[in-house]
């Protein structure tokens, strides 16, 4: 049962500094959580009446203790949340005349394995108010008991990652405004229990965005003769690596127009700061976010948004949360800098004077990203790392790769102006990370003769995988240029985690063909009718199960055309191909999410599909 494992309070003592005041339960699975006091009361906490923070701690089953740092040398890449806990923390400062330091500072935190812990802010807010009126271990214990009358796991749906992506990347209501306005009952026929939490159309038109997949939970907090009811709005779906109320669009908008990150180095690469940030996170460099004026909650949002960013904004890459620290202080620097790579947030300006502590510094206040000059010094850098960052650096553009990066940044700028900017930005970031993974797959297969990124390609029933180039020379040139970047990523935790998850994947079609590769060929290449026919026939042949359709739909978001790339086969010159595509669309139409994608097709495509079905039925009836 998923619950609130610990409820904690901390105070700032004028003589001892941050001190853990109460902990409930006192003797839990691992009772020593005193190290949390420093994190619960961050730097400059006295400057604000209240603040929030969110961070992770790790439980070691071997030593039976909690720690801020996971054992990086002994990471188990099997996906599991059992050893990582989320800590949501509220901070309060009181001005009291006549007291030392002019007042007092308190904090209350909940520690849980519940990934949507940020949604419990109203609950923690109310718990603090109750505790503040009668601060004692007894009050804290009663609040902890009230919290755990609920099973938090019941608040979100157990969906596959592909199903979660379908719901997160598609704004279904915007595609069905006409249906909702004229015939609201239509939606009742096409939405089943898996998406019951979507707001139903009523007298007014409802706009559904990425953040609308929520459920409401009402808690009753009872302690010391007080009884308070609190309602929390909790996301119904969970995307790995996307923790908190992150805004990737805000992160990108903050740094996209910044100056060159290489101003303090001898590298003259003209590359956007966003590309530098993504590359640094991909290859597990030490990335530090700094603010001297913003709140701890703002700092945490930037760090967590960066974690989501490098995941492809959709959990495509996982594992970075193990080395992510939304807030860290000077007392933990020694352990932090020993890590081969990290993503962290700090509020102490002392970090700016120690370029040996970080590789990339993201200054939130000045909206700049800076690469450490120490990264290129003979004293601190091996020859392999130096070659990674000079003319063969993953940060240094060549013509083709630079064009891809420039198009990526151009698209981001355009999407940042859109009404549904967060969804569009996430989709574009996913495509960018996806293209990197697919090129890395082609690199491994060509130069290493096998690819852990795709262990099935040699046995594919329908050949073709990785990235698609116009010719072999272009392919070899780009892969050779990107080789240092690929090799650096192959040492990163996100690479190892991705390989493990793909090896354990149960979706049947993944073992038969590379759907992404062939969808791109249909979208972007000048295919002959024969080549197109082979792809359409292979899709119909291998996309059979519900998981297969889920995977297909997760690669066909509505705002990039949806099923139109499939429907194009309805107009093929071959009757066999037209029938095959019609059968595939029939399969998709009966799928729980596929029916929504099908209805988003234009009227001509739907009419053509209906006509082909009817003709096929007539021929069958005539025999």
Curated annotation (Swiss-Prot):
InterPro entries in the cross-refs: Actin_polarity_regulatory, Afi1_N, Tripartite_DENN
GO BP of this protein: actin cortical patch localization; establishment of cell polarity
Pfam families per the UniProt record, alphabetical: Afi1, SPA
Domain cDENN: from-to ranges: 248-386
Protein localization: Cytoplasm, Cell cortex; Nucleus
Domain dDENN: 388-476
Keyword terms: Cytoplasm, Nucleus
Function of the molecule: Involved in polarity establishment.
UniProt name for this protein: AFI1-like protein C776.06c
Source organism of this protein record: Schizosaccharomyces pombe (strain 972 / ATCC 24843)
């Amino acid at each position: 049962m998923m619950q609130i494992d610990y409820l904690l309070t901390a105070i700032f003592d004028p003589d001892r500094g941050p001190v853990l005041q109460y902990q409930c339960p006192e003797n839990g699975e691992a009772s020593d959580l005193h190290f949390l006091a420093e994190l619960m009361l961050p730097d400059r906490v006295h400057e604000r009446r209240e603040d929030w923070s969110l961070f992770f701690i790790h439980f070691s089953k071997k030593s039976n203790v909690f720690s801020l740092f996971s054992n990086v040398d002994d990471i188990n890449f099997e996906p599991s949340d059992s050893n990582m806990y989320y800590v949501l923390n509220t901070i309060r400062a009181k001005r009291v005349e006549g007291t030392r330091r002019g007042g007092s500072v308190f904090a209350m935190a909940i520690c849980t394995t519940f990934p949507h812990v940020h949604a419990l802010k109203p609950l923690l807010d109310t718990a603090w108010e109750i505790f503040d009126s009668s601060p004692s271990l007894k009050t804290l214990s009663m609040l902890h008991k009230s919290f755990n009358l609920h099973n938090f796991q019941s608040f979100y749906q157990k969906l596959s990652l592909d199903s979660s992506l379908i719901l997160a990347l598609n704004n279904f209501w915007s595609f069905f405004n006409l249906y909702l306005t004229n015939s609201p009952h239509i939606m009742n026929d096409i939405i089943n229990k898996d998406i019951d939490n979507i707001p139903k159309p009523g007298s007014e038109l409802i706009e559904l965005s990425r953040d609308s997949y929520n459920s409401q939970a009402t808690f009753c907090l009872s302690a010391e003769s007080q009884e308070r009811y609190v309602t929390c709005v909790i996301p119904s779906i969970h995307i790995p690596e996307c923790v908190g109320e992150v805004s990737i669009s805000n992160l990108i908008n903050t740094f996209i127009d910044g100056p060159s990150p290489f101003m303090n180095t001898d590298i003259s690469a003209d590359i956007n700061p966003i590309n530098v940030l993504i590359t640094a996170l991909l290859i597990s460099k030490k990335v530090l976010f700094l603010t001297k004026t913003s709140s701890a909650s703002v700092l945490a949002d930037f760090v967590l948004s960066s974690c989501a960013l490098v995941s492809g904004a959709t959990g495509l890459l996982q594992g970075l949360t193990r080395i992510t620290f939304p807030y860290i202080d000077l007392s933990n620097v020694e352990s932090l800098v020993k890590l081969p790579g990290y993503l962290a947030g700090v509020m102490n300006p002392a970090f700016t004077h120690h370029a040996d502590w970080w590789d990339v510094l993201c200054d939130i206040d000045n909206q700049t990203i800076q690469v450490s000059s120490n990264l290129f010094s003979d004293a601190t850098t091996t020859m392999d790392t130096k070659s990674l960052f000079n003319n063969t650096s993953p940060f240094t553009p060549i013509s083709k790769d630079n064009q891809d990066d420039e198009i990526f940044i151009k698209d981001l700028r355009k999407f940042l102006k859109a009404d549904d900017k967060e969804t569009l930005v996430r989709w574009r970031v996913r495509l960018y990370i996806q293209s990197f993974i697919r090129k890395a797959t082609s690199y491994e297969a060509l130069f290493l003769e096998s690819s852990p990124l795709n262990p099935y390609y040699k046995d594919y029933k329908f050949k073709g995988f990785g990235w698609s180039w116009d010719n072999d020379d272009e392919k070899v040139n780009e892969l050779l240029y990107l080789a240092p970047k690929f090799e650096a990523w192959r040492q990163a935790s996100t690479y190892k985690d991705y390989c493990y998850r793909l090896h354990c994947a149960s979706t049947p079609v993944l073992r038969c063909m590379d759907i992404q590769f062939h969808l791109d060929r249909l979208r972007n290449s000048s295919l002959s009718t024969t080549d197109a026919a082979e792809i359409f026939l292979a899709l119909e042949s291998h996309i059979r199960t519900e998981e297969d359709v889920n995977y297909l739909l997760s690669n066909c978001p509505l705002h990039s055309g949806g099923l139109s790339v499939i429907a194009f086969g309805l107009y093929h010159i071959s009757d066999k191909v037209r029938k095959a595509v019609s059968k595939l669309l029939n399969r998709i139409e009966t799928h729980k999410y596929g029916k929504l994608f099908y209805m988003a097709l234009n009227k001509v495509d739907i009419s053509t599909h209906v006509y082909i079905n009817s003709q096929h039925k007539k021929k069958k009836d005539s025999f």
